[in-house]
């Protein structure tokens, strides 16, 4: 016997279903549920008088059951915007589908059986995304990691050794000894970490040593001398060991111009940091490189999106980060050459066109580690307001744009750095790094951060209260952030050479090491929803940017969503 209920009543009980729409926080972005895995009438819910009870939604006889199920969640990922249950076992995602007890419920996936051994997170009215990946971290201060977690980022890739002058400017962990110490320090934090060695060397020995010591990639930075010889050698060694190379090119064109760098790269895969150039790179035309098929381009978040305040804040920021002296005219000229309104405006549009593929932070070194997710969605909102619907979207929803932008900080950095077999999306077999958001707080303040299948970070109330919700509600570490659970639910990414040599055992690491792979074969075409390769041109006098002949320009935003109203307390 069927019972028909109003759509609004159904949404109130179980969350939105196929065809329902919702707004993402206070943005102009609207999503529409494309598919619902539920079998209507057999939804699985937990609580007093609810479904997940022994012999009802919980199987009495099954032994091979889930460790954790997230029920009736709205899932946003590069592959779709759907509603369903997420099954997790042994810290890994089983799949998205219909969970429950197949003995009493219709449509239950045999891999998603709920039993007495299953924990539950109620996902009704919640959005779930894959844990974010920040691929441009200066490891200056450990305090960056709680900030990143509090914005939904669970994987950090970069370099450094703490607040050393070199680390404040460059994303490198140089040398075998420094690499070992940072790998050991990684054991203290409930996130996945990977470290880039210093790539600036014209001879191979030091580069090989760093890779064998555990570097998951190499970083070329202009402050160490990103010459054509260093670029060529770094890429040659990376090709040999299958690790990624990230590059910050020569702003002052001292060792060569953009064309010289392109010749040195010679068609080999490379991740270009802050591709627009305000964060560094050949002035004024480094942005042209985003159109190359072998370039994996990213932005850092201070220029995301272009606003009336963007230019004003950058000069002092740059002087501090690159150890420049405001009393030296050449240092001031160096800084001023990098800050160009025209290319920053074009950067907004190149993101919307899917030309620039990733967004990262540049943490404490011209970037804010706790704002990667927020600034990504601010950029998407600004482009919706200024440019209208994307091709494939409609007046009903912005699903295509939402998929494009979420890929910029999830699957695409995972693909670029050879870790997509472990993280970056909500797909079977991947580490269960999941972020739960209330829709009204999407992109700003997550509710729950699940790390490797266990809650590691949470917006939690007073621990002495009678219930979990009383103020002050603060982001606090949960049990997944302590003891042996931390090492069992997070990974340290290293080169295959280091992994195979047993670097974890050599250094007595508590976290499992995971080898990066496929770093040298990935191309721009492999990056999801963000693989356009137009011919980009920059006028050397006006800095005007064109893609396939079309002028790329937009007005700076005077106000943004996901801003002050969310940070009153």
Swiss-Prot record:
EC number: 3.5.1.5
Urease domain sequence ranges: 131-569
Cystines in this chain: none
Location(s), subcellular: Cytoplasm
Subunit structure: Heterotrimer of UreA (gamma), UreB (beta) and UreC (alpha) subunits. Three heterotrimers associate to form the active enzyme.
Catalytic residue list: 322 (proton donor)
Keywords, in A-Z order: Cytoplasm, Hydrolase, Metal-binding, Nickel
Positions annotated to bind Ni(2+) 2: 219, 248, 274
Annotated positions binding substrate: 221
Post-translational modification: Carboxylation allows a single lysine to coordinate two nickel ions.
Gene Ontology molecular function: any one: urease activity
Any one of the GO CC terms: cytoplasm
Residues that, per the record, bind Ni(2+) 1: 136, 138, 219, 362
Annotated metabolic or biological route of this protein: Nitrogen metabolism; urea degradation; CO(2) and NH(3) from urea (urease route): step 1/1
Pfam families reported for this sequence: Amidohydro_1 (PF01979), Urease_alpha (PF00449)
Record-linked SUPFAM superfamilies: Composite domain of metallo-dependent hydrolases, Metallo-dependent hydrolases
Protein name per UniProt: Urease subunit alpha
EC category name: hydrolase
Catalysed reactions listed for this entry: urea + 2 H2O + H(+) = hydrogencarbonate + 2 NH4(+)
Gene Ontology BP term (one): urea catabolic process
Positions carrying N6-carboxylysine: 219
Family assignment from sequence similarity: Belongs to the metallo-dependent hydrolases superfamily. Urease alpha subunit family.
């Amino acid at each position: 016997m069927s019972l028909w209920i109003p759509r609004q009543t159904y949404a109130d009980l179980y969350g939105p279903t196929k065809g329902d729409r919702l707004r993402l926080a206070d943005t102009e972005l609207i999503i529409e549920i494309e598919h619902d895995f539920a079998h209507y009438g057999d939804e699985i819910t937990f609580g007093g008088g609810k479904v997940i009870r022994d012999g009802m939604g919980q199987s009495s006889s099954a032994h091979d059951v889930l460790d954790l199920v997230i029920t009736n969640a709205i899932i946003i990922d590069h592959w779709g915007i759907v509603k369903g249950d997420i099954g997790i076992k042994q810290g890994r995602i089983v799949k998205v589908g219909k969970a429950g007890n197949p003995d009493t419920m219709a449509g239950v996936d045999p891999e998603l059986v709920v039993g007495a051994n299953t924990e539950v997170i109620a996902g009704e009215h919640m959005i779930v995304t894959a844990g974010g990946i920040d691929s441009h971290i200066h490891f200056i201060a450990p305090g960056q990691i709680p900030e990143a977690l509090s914005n939904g980022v669970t994987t950090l890739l970069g370099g450094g050794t703490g607040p050393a002058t070199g680390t404040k400017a460059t994303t490198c962990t140089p040398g075998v000894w420094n690499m070992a110490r940072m790998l050991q320090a990684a054991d203290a934090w409930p996130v996945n970490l990977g470290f880039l060695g210093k790539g600036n060397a014209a001879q191979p020995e030091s580069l090989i040593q760093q890779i064998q010591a555990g570097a998951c990639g190499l970083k070329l930075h202009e402050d160490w001398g990103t010459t054509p010889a260093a670029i060529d050698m770094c890429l040659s060694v990376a090709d040999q060991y299958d690790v990624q190379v990230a590059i910050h090119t020569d702003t002052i064109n001292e060792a060569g111009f953009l064309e010289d760098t392109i010749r040195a790269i010679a068609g080999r895969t490379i991740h270009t940091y802050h591709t627009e150039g305000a964060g560094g790179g050949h002035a004024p035309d480094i942005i042209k490189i985003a159109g190359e098929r072998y370039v994996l381009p990213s932005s850092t978040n201070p220029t995301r999106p272009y606003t009336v305040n963007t230019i004003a804040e950058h000069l002092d920021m740059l002087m501090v980060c690159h150890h420049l002296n405001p009393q030296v005219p050449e240092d001031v000229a160096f800084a001023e050459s990098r800050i160009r309104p025209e290319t920053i405006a074009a950067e907004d549009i190149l993101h919307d066109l899917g030309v620039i593929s990733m967004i990262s932070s540049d943490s404490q070194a011209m970037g804010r580690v706790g704002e990667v997710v927020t600034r990504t969605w601010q950029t998407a909102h600004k482009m919706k307001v200024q440019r209208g619907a994307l091709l494939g979207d409609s007046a009903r929803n912005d699903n295509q744009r939402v998929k494009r932008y979420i890929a910029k900080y999830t699957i695409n950095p995972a693909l670029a750095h050879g870790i997509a077999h472990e993280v970056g999306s909500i797909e079977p077999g991947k580490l269960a790094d999941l972020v739960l958001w209330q829709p009204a707080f999407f992109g700003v303040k997550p509710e729950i951060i699940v790390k490797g299948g266990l809650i590691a970070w949470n917006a939690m109330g007073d621990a002495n209260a009678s219930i979990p919700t009383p103020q002050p509600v603060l982001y606090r570490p949960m049990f997944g952030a302590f003891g042996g659970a931390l090492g069992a639910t997070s990974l340290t990414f290293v080169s295959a050479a280091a992994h195979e040599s047993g670097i974890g055992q050599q250094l007595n690491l508590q976290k499992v090491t995971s080898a990066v792979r496929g770093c040298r074969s990935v191309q721009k075409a492999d990056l999801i929803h963000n693989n356009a390769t137009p011919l980009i041109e920059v006028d050397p006098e006006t800095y005007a940017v064109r893609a396939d002949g079309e002028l790329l320009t937009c007005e700076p935003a005077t106000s943004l969503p996901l801003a002050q109203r969310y940070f009153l307390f």
